[in-house]
Design a protein with these regions (language model features):
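Short glycine/serine/threonine-rich phosphate/pyrophosphate-binding segments
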Residues: 13-17, 79-92, 96-110, 117, ...
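Glycine-rich phosphate/diphosphate-binding loop of Rossmann-like nucleotide-binding domains
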Residues: 15-16, 31-33, 39, 145-207, ...
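N-terminal phosphate-binding or glycine-rich loops at protein starts, especially the Walker A/P-loop
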Residues: 1-42
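Glycine-rich phosphate/nucleotide-binding loop
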Residues: 111-124, 128-138, 218-222, 226-335
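Phosphate/nucleotide-donor binding subsite
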Residues: 49-94
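Short helix-capping segments at alpha-helix termini
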Residues: 25-28, 46-54, 167, 197-203
Length: 336
């Protein structure tokens, strides 16, 4: 198996990407095609004593910056690491693509270069979000700001396949993010989506879920448009950061707090581990014909390594093939 990795993507590239890639090669036994500035990658590897065993480098002369307009960048920067990597994936030179680069460019590239599964207009960005009972899959979390009901039905089908195949959960539950639990709640689009999801084959739709209940982790998949999903994701990240910061201040405030921290150290460590997004890897663009994984822009080595692990699981379990079969069933049911 070969995983294509963007060596230039993210705030900590290429060092963190190199470290995470080398760890993944060693731990997971994958082969990697690293796309980026070969000179810079080799120099960084030499300076930090990072082995390049199992990593084939493909030189790129351009980089897509976060400030670049996504569609224009994909069309004009043909020698960028993202475009080169996605083309290698399309040509069958690798089995999946991992990048911590521009989300917008990856979304456009996944649509225009890799192309989408039949029945999918545009790929949905999905991510596992830490929660109280168990992490849940949130999609769309930023790629498609406006969605039609049929798109949300496709998201539900693909999300169920992902949680089943990658997370190993049988018969995952699906909920629609809304401002109330009743069927009558929400905009006309959400009310129509609710009825469509009730009739969608192959998923366990449990109805609407209110934002206050999402962090409990009572469902496996939360479906919404990209605007709503991005707000949920960023609010969750902000609240988690605030609470951990408040705990730290409380423990360091006085001697009693420091003693309490020593007694609760293992529990606090478990909480931080549970809330660490890097443990879950990256965010897949569900609906692309082949696995495209977006690692967090601030990913360190652990995040990159886990994103590669995630890509490996997607390939091993034929995620894209499974999603296409489920989408075909959805299309047939909608035509009846």
């Amino acid at each position: 198996m070969k995983i294509i990795v963007d060596m230039m993507g993210g705030d900590n590239a290429p060092l963190a990407v190199l470290e995470g890639t080398a760890q993944a090669v060693k731990e997971y036994g994958v082969q990697v095609i690293g796309v980026g500035s070969e000179e810079l990658v080799r120099k960084t590897a030499a300076e930090h004593n990072i082995p390049l065993d199992g990593i084939e480098l493909v030189n790129c002369t351009e980089t897509i910056e976060m400030c670049d307009e996504p569609a224009r960048a994909i069309r004009s920067k043909k020698e960028s690491s993202i475009v080169v990597g996605l083309n290698l994936l399309k040509e069958g030179k690798g089995d999946a693509f991992v990048s911590a680069g521009s989300t917008g460019a990856l979304h456009v590239g996944a649509s225009l270069i890799v192309r989408t599964l039949k029945g999918v207009k545009r790929p949905a960005l999905a991510t596992m979000v830490p929660a109280k009972n168990k992490a849940y899959l949130l999609l769309d979390c930023g790629a498609n700001v406006e969605c039609r009901p049929e798109m949300l039905a496709a998201f539900a089908v693909m999300g169920s396949c992902y949680v089943n195949r990658v997370e190993g959960r049988t018969a995952p539950t699906v909920a629609l993010a809304n401002n109330g639990a009743e069927e009558s709640k929400g905009t006309p689009m959400l009310r129509e989506a609710h009825q469509l999801l009730k009739a969608t084959p192959g998923i366990r739709f449990v109805g609407n879920i209110e934002p206050r209940d999402v962090p409990n982790g009572d469902v496996d998949v939360v479906v919404c448009d990209g605007f709503t999903g991005n707000v949920i994701l960023k609010l969750t990240e902000g609240v988690a950061k605030m609470l951990l910061g408040m705990l730290k201040e409380m423990f360091l405030a006085n001697l009693g707090g420091k003693i309490a921290y020593l007694l609760l150290k293992s529990g606090v460590g478990s909480l931080k581990h549970q809330m660490d997004s890097e443990e879950y890897g990256g965010a897949p663009f569900l609906g692309a014909k082949q696995p495209v994984i977006k690692a967090h822009g601030s990913s360190k080595a652990k995040g990159i390594k886990n994103a590669i692990r995630q890509a490996k699981i997607c390939v091993e379990n034929d995620l894209c093939g499974t999603m296409q079969s489920a989408l075909d069933e959805l299309t047939t049911s909608q035509a009846d």
